Amino acid sequence: MNIEQKWQQIWQEEKAFEVPNESSKPKYYVLEMLPYPSGKIHVGHVRNYSIGDVVARFMTMQGFNVLHPMGWDSFGLPAENAAIKNNSHPKEWTYSNIENMKKQLKSMGFSYDWSREINSCDPDYYKHEQKFFLELYERNLAYQKESLVNWDPVDNTVLANEQVVDGRGWRSGAIVEKRYLKQWFLKITNYAEELLNEIPNLTEWPEAVRSMQEKWIGKSVGANFRFKIKDNEDVIEVFSTKPETIFGASFVGIAFNHPIIEKLVSKTPEIENFIAKCSNITGSAEFDKAEKEGIFTGLYVVHPFDSNITLPVVITNFVLMDYGTGAVFGCPAHDQRDHELAVKINLPIKQVIEADTDVQKAAYTEDGIIINSGFLNGLSTNEAKQRVIEEFEKLGIGKRTINYRLKDWGISRQRFWGCPIPIIHCDSCGLVPVPDSDLPVTLPDDVKFDGHGNPLDNHPTWKHVNCPKCSKPAIRETDTFDTFFESSWYFTRYCNSQALEMTDKKACDYWLPVDKYIGGIEHAVMHLLYARFFTKVMNEQDYVSVREPFKGLFTQGMVLHATYKDEHNNWLYPEEVIKKGNEFFHKENGGLVTQGRIEKMSKSKKNLIDLETMQQQYGADAIRFFVLSDSPPEKDLEWSASGIEGSARFINKLEQMQETIIKLSDNKNTNKELKRLIHFTIKHVAEDIKHFALNRAIARMRELFNAISSEINKEEIDVQNAKHGFNVLIQLLNPFIPHITEEIWQKLGHKTFLYNAAFPTFDESMLELDTYVIAVQVNGKLRDTYEFNTSASEDEIKQIAINLPKVQKFLEGKEPKKIILVPKKIINIIC
């Protein structure tokens, strides 16, 4: 058994990281984002977990009762795809992966409280979210409607807009199609205002994430008002954030799927083709990127304030049906999208805000004074906005409106491996909730996976049930929850993973909110927003007392590695490649290999570093130390062989230093600078960890190591401070490299464990230097420096500075006219 295995066994036997739900100590809850059990952990994952582990171990040493749990986000498409490939049940693949990944996490020495482990595909977990869903349904926060959805034709499932990347499914890479399907939604929009208003209070979140959430919620204040269609009784209702520019309108733009098209528009082949083209654009981001285009419908609307003015109705590719009303009026002079379209299809550009630029060349989008606008002339844009809305209200055609970019959360997924939605469809009774006594609705074991559609739809018996209300034959809902459902509340379950109800309210009151949540910034507008929404609803259902789940958030950078391709354009693993000179070759067949970009580690591009191989070669501590030392945690880290080798060498030197230290005999020599550095390092390493400057903390500890190393190689050693400094160093390093530091701690003669030892303390008075250096200037130019004793008075400093030979040379016998002293920094002698 090696040192790392030895200490992992001791920690397990001691239940070192299991914590109570009550304590006289202050609590601290640190959590890394719930991982998907993909099968293997690579070194890219290790960085995230290592950051969390340093924080957990440090806060424990600071005297906190620290909750640091782990579990598995185990529903999802990869398990189902593996089941199709291997002709097995997703459960087998998932549980096998969990077992393997749990071993890997334990082998890295992470301080998880495994007694609180959760698994989201366990019926004992998801039965609670099924009940919670029914509570949402009862409150009309969950509903079903037909919706135009993003359909992945390869994975045969619906994708959220956020899961569509450049028009393709985020997992399969297939070109996404648009389809109308009945979908289940959660009314997250009911909470849009609170979600937005609370963002400024998330002061311990990165500004980038707060900004992304604010933009995603996308609050717009404007007006809804109606245009009457010329020669028709129908109207088109538009939403505008700039209704004050109504006199600059030159068209009304509608979404490609606006209902007025089916009702009134004669679909020419050109219109059909344009609609088809628009329907292939998926996600609002894709609409934003697309070149602005439009096609005339043949319809006109009448201007609300001048019946002599008519505006053409244009189908555009930048108006979305699910934002506002699916229709806008276009004012090309003061909106850049409208301007681009107007230029393209030759629409008039009419200026209605004073500008110092030519609106025919580009839209003027700033505020100003209204012109060419009848009763609005001379008003500021803000005054005009209020006035025009008043006029809409007087005419009974419009009102002030707030819109949000945020849409209700579509939670339906047409896949097997997910939590079943607990609803029954009855021809007589409609939608019927599954009774509490019949929860959980579990997935069948006898399923066939042929890669086409949802096996639940095709199961011979599972979906056939009797209606709980009328007892007639009925059908179960065969959609399953989006897997973000499970990860939107799991952090509350850790407070007591054995609770009979969804949460243990008392335990949640103690632990929540999470003090520090650690994960990737890619979750800013999905998981993090959904978790905030769930927490607010759970608060209203009396499951938790908080309304915000995460007090602090830290988003770590990615681990990067070079990519490699062989002569046939196939991706290669790094271990399959060898470098000779400046070229790369395939280890087995000798073929030429092309080195590509340095990118985020990913399975698809095979630029992964296998964790087990690295552990066998260097050990867990060396891996942890490298991923934390080479770059600030919030920045990307490039994996390098030299970096991990350097970390391993440092650990070896620690062991060698320990052997030297214990052989030293006490003496009375004193090195004040070493003593000061010990206290300085304690103070600043603690501050660095608190601020997530972990690489800086490591640099400081290396500096202390070097100082001790230098000291013990002197003829006259300060043994007392060398020994004390080394003991302190081992304590400081423990959160970073826990195995070897526990081992060294024991060899130094300690009978306690480091994992629950107190963090070293420092003496503030020891941080003061006995001397300091001042720059000496003559007439503002540096002429010398001098080391002064801290006890020197101002008069003494001035006198010494004047008499310095280099200063005397430039004074040329003159008396100083003035002496300016900046304490402990600069003295400037003016003559």
From Swiss-Prot:
CDD domains documented for this protein: Anticodon_Ia_Leu_BEm, LeuRS_core
Compartment(s) where it occurs, according to its Swiss-Prot or TrEMBL record: Cytoplasm
InterPro entries recorded: aa-tRNA-synth_I_CS (IPR001412), aa-tRNA-synth_Ia (IPR002300), Leu-tRNA-ligase (IPR002302), Leu_tRNA-synth_edit (IPR025709), M/V/L/I-tRNA-synth_anticd-bd (IPR013155), Methionyl/Leucyl_tRNA_Synth (IPR015413), Rossmann-like_a/b/a_fold (IPR014729), tRNAsynth_Ia_anticodon-bd (IPR009080)
Record's catalysed reaction(s): tRNA(Leu) + L-leucine + ATP = L-leucyl-tRNA(Leu) + AMP + diphosphate
Enzyme Commission number: 6.1.1.4
A molecular function (GO) term: aminoacyl-tRNA deacylase activity
The protein's enzyme class: ligase
Keyword Protein biosynthesis: yes
Gene Ontology CC: one annotated term: cytoplasm
TM ranges: none
Alphabetically ordered keywords of this record: Aminoacyl-tRNA synthetase, ATP-binding, Cytoplasm, Ligase, Nucleotide-binding, Protein biosynthesis
BP GO annotations: leucyl-tRNA aminoacylation
Residue ranges annotated as motif 'KMSKS' region: 600-604
Residues reported to bind ATP: K603
Record's keyword annotation contains Oxidoreductase: no
Motif range ('HIGH' region): 35-45
Family as reported in the entry's similarity comment: Belongs to the class-I aminoacyl-tRNA synthetase family.
Name assigned to this protein: Leucine--tRNA ligase
Originating organism: Rickettsia bellii (strain RML369-C)
Gene name tied to this protein: leuS
